């Protein structure tokens, strides 16, 4: 196994984790709909317990996503998580209050009331997808950081990378295109949340409301996502010379990546078709409740392709707007050959982990959630 192969292999795995994370944001998307779908306390508890079965998957995937970056591309981890820490701290804090809200909203002695924690779930449902989408957009639009590896020998301050301003990552929200993708991810999460609850909840009224909410959320998602994607295809991209490592701007770089790596373009089209199929069939057929699966697979495929064209084909996946030559690539930010090779063998266990997750998912969802189950005091309902 060559060093180049392992660098591309680990970018593929991280891209897959990122794609799975976006799919699992259906938990956050559904939680933004607590009061839109739930008109009674029992209906709201149905929504919360539906997502409550899966919130750990989203949280652990987020942590694993960051951990994989730390192991495979540590310079990105130190630059982004260490420099843009306010952005990531807000994201992580919103996920922490999510966990607390699930556990304590209906506990005895909750003097804040269940509604307070339900509002916290909505906050996480909005902030999480919005900021994660904005963070991913910086892979294409750049961030303000400087990298100087020579500083590692400086005794007074051996800091390799630092943020170029005092915003500590919050400046990403000043770029309207980062916000556009963030809003697109938010509406996508709401769509997936609606499809998931329609499949997971055995309550006719709630399922009908989910269907009615699909169309406006889909239209909003398409407006924001297509605006970002079309602009992405025509904008200049960040490329590096494979021999020298010098980074330069290249016109239509991301479109070129899709054309050069043409199998990815096919995967992208399949993903879009699957996503729209899941949405439209659910909206058009009253008795169809499995739209989450084609839509979920489509989401994973589309996001996977976006990540891959951001890092493969001599593309700088984390561009620097402050210093172009500080931009990070899978070559200049990766771990050593020994580390990547060792982790390669460990990664062969991933299919077994996925099989266990699938088993747990099936065990939790083999029976659809009902109002009676939520009302049962002996159940473990939230």
Question: Where would I find each of the regions flagged by the language model?
Answer:
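Membrane-interface capping segments at transmembrane-helix boundaries
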Residues: 280-287, 356-371
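N-terminal signal-anchor module of multipass membrane proteins
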Residues: 1-59, 63-66
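Transmembrane-helix bundle segments that line or gate the permeation/cavity pathway
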Residues: 24-32, 52, 60-108, 124-151, ...
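A C-terminal functional module that forms or caps the active site or interfaces directly
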Residues: 296-326
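Short, highly charged, low-complexity non-transmembrane loops/tails of multi-pass membrane proteins
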Residues: 366-382
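Alpha-helical transmembrane segments
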Residues: 8-22, 82-95, 122, 126, ...
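Long, contiguous internal "core" modules enriched in hydrophobic/ aromatic residues
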Residues: 108-289, 305
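Short, membrane-exposed interhelical loops at transmembrane-helix boundaries
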Residues: 246-252, 318-339
């Amino acid at each position: 196994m060559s060093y180049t192969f392992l660098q591309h292999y680990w970018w593929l795995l991280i891209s897959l984790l990122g794609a799975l994370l976006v799919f699992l944001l259906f938990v956050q998307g559904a939680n933004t709909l607590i009061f839109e779908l739930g008109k009674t306390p029992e209906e709201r508890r149905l929504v919360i317990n539906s997502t409550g079965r899966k919130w750990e998957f989203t949280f652990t995937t987020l942590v694993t996503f960051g951990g994989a970056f730390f192991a495979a591309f540590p310079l990105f981890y130190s630059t982004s998580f260490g420099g843009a820490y306010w952005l990531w701290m807000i994201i992580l804090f919103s996920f922490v209050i999510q966990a607390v809200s699930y556990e304590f909203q209906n506990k005895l002695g909750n003097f804040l009331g269940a509604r307070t924690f339900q509002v916290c779930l909505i906050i996480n449902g909005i902030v999480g997808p919005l900021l994660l989408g904005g963070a991913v957009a910086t892979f294409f639009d750049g961030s303000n950081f400087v990298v100087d590896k020579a500083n590692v020998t400086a005794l007074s301050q051996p800091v390799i990378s630092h943020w170029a301003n005092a915003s500590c990552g919050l400046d990403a929200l000043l770029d309207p295109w980062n916000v556009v993708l963030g809003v697109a991810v938010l509406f996508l999460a709401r769509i997936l949340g609606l499809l998931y609850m329609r499949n997971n909840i055995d309550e006719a009224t709630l399922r009908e409301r989910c269907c009615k909410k699909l169309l406006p959320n889909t239209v909003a998602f398409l407006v924001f996502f297509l605006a970002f994607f079309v602009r992405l295809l025509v904008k200049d991209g960040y490329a590096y010379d494979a021999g020298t490592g010098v980074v330069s701007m290249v016109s239509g770089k991301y479109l070129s990546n899709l054309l050069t790596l043409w199998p990815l373009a096919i995967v992208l089209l399949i993903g879009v078709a699957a996503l729209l199929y899941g949405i439209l069939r659910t909206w058009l057929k009253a008795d169809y409740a499995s739209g989450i699966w084609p839509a979920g697979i489509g989401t994973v495929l589309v996001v996977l392709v976006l990540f891959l064209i951001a890092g493969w084909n001599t593309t700088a996946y984390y561009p620097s707007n402050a210093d172009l030559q500080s931009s990070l690539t899978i070559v200049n930010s990766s771990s050593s050959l020994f580390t990547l090779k060792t982790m390669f063998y460990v990664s062969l266990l991933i299919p077994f982990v996925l099989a266990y997750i699938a088993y747990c998912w099936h065990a939790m969802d083999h029976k659809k959630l009902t109002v009676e189950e939520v009302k049962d005091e002996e159940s473990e309902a939230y």
